[in-house]
Amino acid sequence: MSANDRRVRVAVVFGGRSNEHAISCVSAGSILRNLDSRRFDVIAVGITPAGSWVLTDANPDALTITNRELPQVKSGSGTELALPADPRRGGQLVSLPPGAGEVLESVDVVFPVLHGPYGEDGTIQGLLELAGVPYVGAGVLASAVGMDKEFTKKLLAADGLPVGAYAVLRPPRSTLHRQECERLGLPVFVKPARGGSSIGVSRVSSWDQLPAAVARARRHDPKVIVEAAISGRELECGVLEMPDGTLEASTLGEIRVAGVRGREDSFYDFATKYLDDAAELDVPAKVDDQVAEAIRQLAIRAFAAIDCRGLARVDFFLTDDGPVINEINTMPGFTTISMYPRMWAASGVDYPTLLATMIETALARGVGLH
């Protein structure tokens, strides 16, 4: 094989310090199964919940949910390593003691399959920019904005895009008064402001439930957002940047959760998503063509409004008055049930092609200011 024919070396980075560690592992397992080994030389770097980087054996079978048991990157499961924040090192991953400084691998591009804080929020993107290593997905700004539900809504609203009503509790305040939320009406959803996978989310149907819901959310994030419940269909759309910088939007998907587990107040929570297999996912969604196209265009506008790059999943409610944007996920789930790859498959882009496009776009973009 000539130098021009050599495979692109991709580091799939997963796990991390957030409470979405396990879902990141499952996403990584799915990606490892679907990367084209003829084109890509793949290494797998796990980050433990404590933050140590470990070179793993890239076994996707170890990164699955089995009998409701969640996967985890464990200390001692491989050689500990680091990525020096030095662009002169050319993407080198070096060992930590013993053998400190030994170059273990050199990579061309990083696929940071990290969900939640300390990964999806601009932190690893900043490290990769400092290290001069191209990476899949949004840059520092869009990653940070997309992780914070408050600032996502603020930027979208400033660009004239439809968002729901909300209230925010920020440190050092410890309580959110009922009067601040009454304008939202009931029910409301109380969430960690910088989190995903529906972890720490509560549905509040009585104001007496608000303090407990805030306390639950604060176990995951000191900043809490309270969102007005929106009556409508839950729709999602994938946005994908091509290597030439053009943007494409996928067919839509719909999540239906009414009556899940026999509860009238059910919503698409963590257990429904990943453990119970209880929600119904329709891909493509059964939506009028004109409405679907309008939502796809809104997804592209939202992507541009936060200066996103690479990919994103934009979540909507379709109400009687039209679509409302709920949030933007700059590194959506890539599990076998995740909507993002399923929507692109329904659009005619299979999983290996989708992953290859993301990597090609990352290499074409490079690093630095754009």
From Swiss-Prot:
Cofactors: Mg(2+); Mn(2+)
Keyword Iron-sulfur: no
Reactions performed catalytically: 2 D-alanine + ATP = D-alanyl-D-alanine + ADP + phosphate + H(+)
GO cellular component annotations of the record: cytosol
Pathway: Cell wall biogenesis; peptidoglycan biosynthesis
UniProt EC number: 6.3.2.4
Subcellular location: Cytoplasm
Domain ATP-grasp: from-to ranges: 153-360
Gene Ontology BP annotations: cell wall organization; peptidoglycan biosynthetic process; regulation of cell shape
Pfam families for this protein: Dala_Dala_lig_C, Dala_Dala_lig_N
Database matches in InterPro entries: ATP-grasp, ATP_grasp_subdomain_1, D-Ala_lig_Van_CS, D_ala_D_ala, Dala_Dala_lig_C, Dala_Dala_lig_N, PreATP-grasp_dom_sf
Positions bound to Mg(2+) 2: 327, 329
Amino-acid positions noted as binding Mg(2+) 1 in the UniProt annotation, renumbered to this chain: 315, 327
GO MF annotations in UniProt: ATP binding; D-alanine-D-alanine ligase activity; metal ion binding
Cofactor: how and how many bound: Binds 2 magnesium or manganese ions per subunit.
HAMAP family: Dala_Dala_lig
Annotated family: Belongs to the D-alanine--D-alanine ligase family.
Record NCBIfam families: D_ala_D_alaTIGR, PRK01372.1, PRK01966.1-4
Protein's job: Cell wall formation.
Record protein name field: D-alanine--D-alanine ligase
Originating species: Mycobacterium bovis (strain ATCC BAA-935 / AF2122/97)
